[in-house]
Amino acid sequence: MDMENLTWLHGKPTASGILKANPEDFVVVEDLGFEPDGEGEHLLVRIRKNGCNTQFVADYLARFAKLHPRLVSYAGLKDRHAVTEQWFCLHLPGKEAPDLATFELEGCEVLEAVRHKRKLRIGSLKGNAFTLVLRHITDRQDVEQRLQQIAAQGVPNYFGSQRFGRGGNNLVQARLWANNEIRVKERSKRSFYLSASRSAMFNLISSYRLAQQLSTTVLEGDALQLSGRGSWFVAQADELAALQQRVTAGELNITAPLPGDSELGTHGEALAFEQACLAEQTELLSLIKRERVEGSRRAVLLKPQNMISNWWDDVTLELSFWLPAGSFATSVVREIMNQDRADDTDIIE
């Protein structure tokens, strides 16, 4: 998907700069949202890694602990071209924990290990704390103004280009699969292609809402989400004024669909709007229904938490913030500056 075609909330930036001049410029620390139990048949291992992707480390841990690879899990993928602190889970029923003091893998450091009663599954993560360094910024004044706007109004909650694969290949393959031009047997590829399809449709609807000044305007039949929650409800016509006040106050978020094999979830005016946005996506919608993917919804806008900016000099900015799981730091950066080098294809947040 071409991110250049998506609408900006604060207008296209005038400043340009570089993200990820080196891995240390992109630091991610997982926030599980809970404290490990301290007992149980699972061992949670927190590792700081640089230059290693998540699955590679998981497979290495399995070999080190003499476990089947399926017995090592994690909450989410992280970029190999960054410094990341991530939790891995080893299933050790009735077994002693391996001696992690002898664990050696270039670019990796074991920070702690603690027992836990439950398996760490994909998505069982509250969020991620990011510390980024943006370099060679051309317009400090514009960036500072945008940081104020982002703190007050947020950014579009777009899925980043990395969700669609290098050069958007996951979406290309999804369309070929949808048209029965290729067969996709590998489970991981099926998952990537379906995820890219749903993410692209979410981005499309969100972009249309922004373009029509509807990102914070409640339509009759909109699906609204309590801030910080996953559940949502439908806006009734006789409640629009009160609901609009709550959206304006930041208590509620307007959502867009990640389409599945069921209805979109909206009604009336909002449903008609979403259907119009997806009118040319029939092949992807058919694929999603054929594969019986469960639908969900996601907030159109995202407000970074605990955002702190620190200028090292007039052209170098250190920026830290927290995002809920599934949201992309690159979508925040997109509202701040244009990237001179679009080196984000491997960032998985």
From Swiss-Prot:
Top-tier EC class: isomerase
GO cellular component: cytosol
Pfam families given in the database record: TruD
Catalyzed reaction equations: uridine(13) in tRNA = pseudouridine(13) in tRNA
Ranges for domain TRUD: 154-302
Keyword Cytoplasm: no
Active site: D79
Domain of life: Bacteria
Residues annotated as binding substrate: F26, N128, F328
CDD domains listed in its UniProt record: PseudoU_synth_EcTruD
Keywords of the record: Isomerase, tRNA processing
GO biological process: pseudouridine synthesis; tRNA pseudouridine synthesis
GO MF terms, alphabetically ordered: pseudouridine synthase activity; RNA binding; tRNA pseudouridine(13) synthase activity
InterPro entries on file: PsdUridine_synth_cat_dom_sf, PsdUridine_synth_TruD, PsdUridine_synth_TruD_CS, PsdUridine_synth_TruD_insert, TruD_catalytic, TruD_insert_sf, TruD_pseudoU_synthase
Assigned EC number: 5.4.99.27
Family under the similarity heading: Belongs to the pseudouridine synthase TruD family.
Function, as annotated: Responsible for synthesis of pseudouridine from uracil-13 in transfer RNAs.
Cross-referenced NCBIfam families: PRK00984.1-4, tRNA_TruD_broad
Name of protein: tRNA pseudouridine synthase D
Organism per entry: Yersinia pestis
Lineage summary: Bacteria, Pseudomonadati, Pseudomonadota, Gammaproteobacteria, Enterobacterales
